[in-house]
Amino acid sequence: MQVLTTSRKPGRKTRRFAKVLARFFNWKYVNRGKLSLEDLAGIAERFWIISEVKGNPAILNLYERGEKTLEVSFTLSNVNKIKMDDSPAVFKGKAPIDPLVFGAIPQTKAGLKLTRKVEFRKKVVVKGDEWLFFYDDEMLFKLRILKISRSSR
């Protein structure tokens, strides 16, 4: 299970975005408080941290075994809060990163065949640098991806 948390003392927008994103990908949202990176690594082997720039959520970092492995910089539209089930998410379109990193259906031959045959409720539509997040054809939010950087280990 992946865990999502925020930087310390997040703003209202960041908390709301974190909770909706965690629910979308079936992650566990953890209130960070005074937890250090070591404490978070003790909770889960893989965890995500959302950081703010000027009070808005702007950076999504993936940590594996305490090491930062991925950083996604983005801008965010308004977040629509909806009750969601535990169904898996699927990416539509060519994603710059493997959707499996997020715990979504992978874009392998078998994964693409499955997405054509089964209608999924949670979809991430990738159009260039924009990722549109939908649940039952209702848009939750839109991310405009500014930069994706991988850390070499």
From Swiss-Prot:
A single GO molecular function term of this UniProt record: rRNA binding
UniProt name for this protein: Probable Brix domain-containing ribosomal biogenesis protein
Species annotation: Archaeoglobus fulgidus (strain ATCC 49558 / DSM 4304 / JCM 9628 / NBRC 100126 / VC-16)
A Gene Ontology BP annotation from the UniProt entry: rRNA processing
Function statement: Probably involved in the biogenesis of the ribosome.
Domain Brix positions: 1-153
Keywords noted in UniProt: Ribosome biogenesis
Domain of life assignment: Archaea
Organismal lineage: Archaea, Methanobacteriati, Methanobacteriota, Archaeoglobi, Archaeoglobales
PROSITE patterns: BRIX
